[in-house]
Amino acid sequence: MHAFRNLLALLLLTLCAALPLSAQDEGEDLGSTEGALFLLLPVGAKAVSLGRAMTPLDGPESAFWNPAGLVAVRESQVVLLRGDPLAGTSTAFSVLWAHPGLGTLGVSYQLLDIGSQAITDIDGNELGSLSVRDHLGVVSAAAQLLESVRLGVNLKIVQFRRSCRGICPDAGTTATTYAFDAGLQILPSERLRIGAMLAHVGPRYQVLNADQADPLPARARLAVAYNLISLLTDDEELGGWLSVEVQDRLLNPGSLSLYLGTELTAGVAEAIFLRAGYVLGDLDQEDGARVGLGFRYERFDLSIAKSLAVSTLTGETEPVHVTFSIRF
């Protein structure tokens, strides 16, 4: 137990050491364009259906949100996450190792395939193809520090890769950086959860050269969740959580986003989940409603989500997001 907590403390100290450098870099030009914006895209069907109001909540998708929520993962499992945001096709997975009484460790990966473009000569003959992809690797650690306090950290490797097959004007571009997340959850009672976190904190993201490096989209999040159903019944197999979350830029505040999420649950070992959410004022997403369903049966969990917000660019809604997990 002490070794696990020491690991968390070491990761947090590393994060604190990185914060001053990051703040100095971003403070030099607060109006600069942020890099690696794919980090702000929602990952996971539960997160999509709850309108991103994930900071006070728990579950396996927390590896891509507030890592403190991984404390509630009591069984080791493999999680597959699939979605098609406007930016491209997102495929991700997590492997989580749960240690009751100690905490949870996780390794996750996300691939965002932005697409490919054929390279042709003046006669229209295809010479090669240019593909653009974003990669994200995450190592997570979470532990219960006190009876009602959870702590989690993520160490992330972020990479942009533009590669060529065949004959291309250039050989391609690769940019790599690192980032940290640090999250906290406080449970004053069984009905109430409070969450806070810093997300995507790290050095500037250099794609071409140092002069054109952009700051990462660092964010501060604060949220609260309350089980409203507990006011009506003491039945532990019924739940009705309402989550409210606010988000702002970490070092250039003033652009608040509001996320609302509701989750109705029936059952424990085998359960069904009805979810709905709303995004308001988010600079990185379309405002509007989201809905979703979840099922838990034996060792399997399946969640499906759909955004009802219509894109101002395409005039359409996003396809369905799916999360599937197997416990072992």
Question: Could you describe each region identified by the protein language model?
Answer:
Residues 24-48, 57, 75-77, 90-328:
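Outer-membrane beta-barrel porins/channels
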